[in-house]
């Protein structure tokens, strides 16, 4: 396994000896009541620390404590601005490597890694080959949530590729990376992300056809999908000058949020028979073709709505909740006419300041919520 324990990693992480220990030294003067607690209680205590690297430092207390942190049910590595200089950031990367190499449990419920952001004076970049072993660890041992956030580097390394390996037991994936994200998919098909219920991808570049295949074939239980500020590579529609088409097909999807996909100028097609909630992009230049007969919540923050371009062909005419804004007055009216019944209407009221009147006026922005029935 690519994440086998490395003795040198353990030595760096623990920094203790077999001859003596801190708790042993204290025990000569007072009774040690903490080390006698159950592993479950000690895990609860260590999980309150800032991150797993701090929990690993408790290894210096005694031989008893050396195995406690290595069986934590959750691994979290979060770093603040103090690690934003290159040398400190490199140490942060090493701490993640060492902790994963020394981890002893067969499975882990959470793997959360947030790397330092670049400093104003010196960029901190993590090459994808450095982050790849972390994803392999998740593929082999994670049974819950995966969250990976790498530094934003102004797109200087967009062409680097990061491969998301097959993760059969991972239930939620949150990826915030500026590189190109690839999916490890078997050629013969098969559900390789069988437990995945939530997927959020931010800032990454993705191949549109690969994303389509991944969502439609390999995520049979996906419930929630968020695509935020991603760069989608797509060929033109049929080679006849038509705009490119991104198709999202899922029999299980219930919530779809593409509100921050402003860079995509093509056609978004959605076929999701179980979709309940949809939040499209704020960019009104994209066409929509939505087939979602169970749609009940629509969050429309786009500056325009054109029934000829934004089609809800197989959606009903009864919404549980509609969110829109009067700042896009004509679009809001046209959108509300699309549905006969709305149980809850939330809209933002914007009144601009008028300069030509004899008395001063003021701009106003507020939210109004109306419930009917």
Kindly label every feature range from the protein language model.
Residues 180, 206, 230-232, 261-263, ...:
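Hydrophobic lipid-interacting interfaces of membrane-associated proteins
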Residues 1-27:
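Terminal membrane/secretory targeting segments in land-plant proteins
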Residues 31, 43, 52, 317-373:
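Innate immune receptor modules and recognition interfaces
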Residues 133-137, 161-168, 186-195, 212-221, ...:
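A structural signal for leucine-rich repeat
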């Amino acid at each position: 396994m690519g994440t086998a324990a490395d003795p040198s990693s353990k030595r760096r992480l623990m920094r203790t000896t077999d001859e003596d220990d801190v708790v042993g030294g204290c025990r000569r003067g007072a009774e040690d009541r903490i080390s006698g607690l159950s592993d479950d209680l000690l895990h609860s205590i260590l999980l309150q620390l800032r991150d797993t690297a701090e929990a690993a430092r408790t290894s210096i207390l005694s031989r008893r404590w050396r195995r406690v942190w290595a069986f934590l049910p959750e691994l979290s590595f979060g770093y603040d601005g103090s690690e934003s200089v290159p040398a400190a950031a490199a140490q942060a990367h090493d701490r993640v490597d060492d902790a994963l190499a020394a981890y002893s449990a067969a499975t882990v419920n959470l793997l959360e890694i947030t790397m330092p952001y670049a400093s104003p004076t010196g960029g901190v970049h993590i090459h994808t080959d450095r982050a790849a072993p972390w994803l392999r660890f998740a593929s082999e041992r994670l049974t819950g949530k995966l969250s990976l956030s790498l530094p934003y580097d102004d797109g200087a390394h967009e062409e680097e590729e990061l491969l998301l390996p097959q993760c059969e037991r991972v239930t939620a994936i949150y990826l915030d990376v500026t590189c190109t994200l690839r999916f490890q998919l078997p050629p013969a098909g098969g559900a390789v992300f069988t437990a995945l219920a939530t997927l959020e991808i931010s800032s990454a570049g993705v191949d549109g056809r690969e994303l389509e295949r991944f969502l439609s074939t390999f995520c049979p239980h996906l419930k929630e999908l968020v695509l935020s500020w991603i760069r989608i590579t797509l060929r033109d529609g049929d080679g006849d000058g038509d705009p490119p088409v991104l198709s999202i097909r899922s029999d299980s999807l219930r919530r779809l949020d593409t509100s921050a996909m402003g860079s995509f100028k093509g056609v978004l097609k959605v076929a999701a028979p179980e979709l309940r909630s949809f939040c499209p992009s704020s960019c009104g230049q994209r066409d929509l073709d939505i087939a979602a007969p169970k749609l009940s919540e629509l969050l429309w923050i786009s500056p325009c709505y054109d029934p000829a371009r934004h089609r809800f062909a197989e959606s009903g005419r009864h919404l549980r909740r509609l969110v829109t804004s009067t700042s896009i007055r004509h679009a809001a009216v046209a959108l509300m006419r699309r549905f006969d019944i709305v149980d809850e209407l939330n809209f933002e009221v914007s009144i601009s300041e008028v300069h030509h009147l004899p008395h001063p006026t003021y701009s106003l922005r507020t939210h109004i919520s109306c419930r009917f029935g």
